[in-house]
Amino acid sequence: MAIQNPYTAYQQNSVNTATPGELTLMLYNGCLKFIRLAAQAIENDDMERKNENLIKAQNIIQELNFTLNRNIELSASMGAMYDYMYRRLVQANIKNDTGMLAEVEGYVTDFRDAWKQAIQSERKDRHGSGGIA
C-alpha cells in the first residue's frame, strides 16, 4: 500500500470538509495561482507551462460560472464578467499577453476579496466572531 504525502492528504481533507463558500474561495485562490504561474511562464518563454496553467485558470472560471445561482439577479452580471474573463484568458494564451493576465488577475482578486469578506461576515453573524477564511 502506497503512503500518501501528508500535504496531499491535508489538501484533500481541506476540500472534503470545506463549506460551499470555502470551496469557492479555494477556486478563486487556485485561479490566481495559475494566472501568476502562466505570467511567469510567458516571461520565461515556457509556452507549454503557460498553456497548462491558463487552461487550468480557464477551467476554474468556467466552473465558477456554471455554479452561479441563476435565480439571483446579480448572477447575470457575474456570469457576463466570468465570460469576459474567460475570453481574456484565451486571448492572453494566444497572444502571450501578460497585460491581459494582469487585468484578469485584478478582477479575480476583487471577486476573491469580496467573497472572503462575505464568508467572514456570515461567520460573524452566525458565531458572533470574525473568523478568518
From Swiss-Prot:
Annotated GO CC locations: cytosol
Pfam families, sorted: FliS (PF02561)
Compartments in which it is found: Cytoplasm, Cytosol
Knockout or disruption consequences: Severe defect in motility on agar plates, forms multiple short filament stubs on the cell surface, decreased expression of flagellin (hag), 30-fold decrease in Hag secretion. All phenotypes are partially suppressed by deletion of csrA, which increases translation of Hag.
Primary location recorded for the protein, binned into one broad class: cytoplasm
Record-linked InterPro entries: FliS, FliS_sf
Top-rank taxon: Bacteria
Keyword RNA-binding: no
Listed transmembrane segments: none
GO BP term (any one): bacterial-type flagellum-dependent cell motility
Keywords for the protein's UniProt record, in alphabetical order: Bacterial flagellum biogenesis, Chaperone, Cytoplasm
Subunit structure, interactors included: Homodimer. Interacts directly with flagellin (hag), forms a 3-way complex of Hag, FliS and FliW in which Flis and FliW do not directly interact.
Role, per record: Essential for filament assembly. May act as a facilitator of flagellin (hag) secretion. Antagonizes translational repressor CsrA indirectly.
Record-stated family: Belongs to the FliS family.
Protein name, entry field: Flagellar secretion chaperone FliS
Source organism per UniProt: Bacillus subtilis (strain 168)
Encoding gene (name): fliS
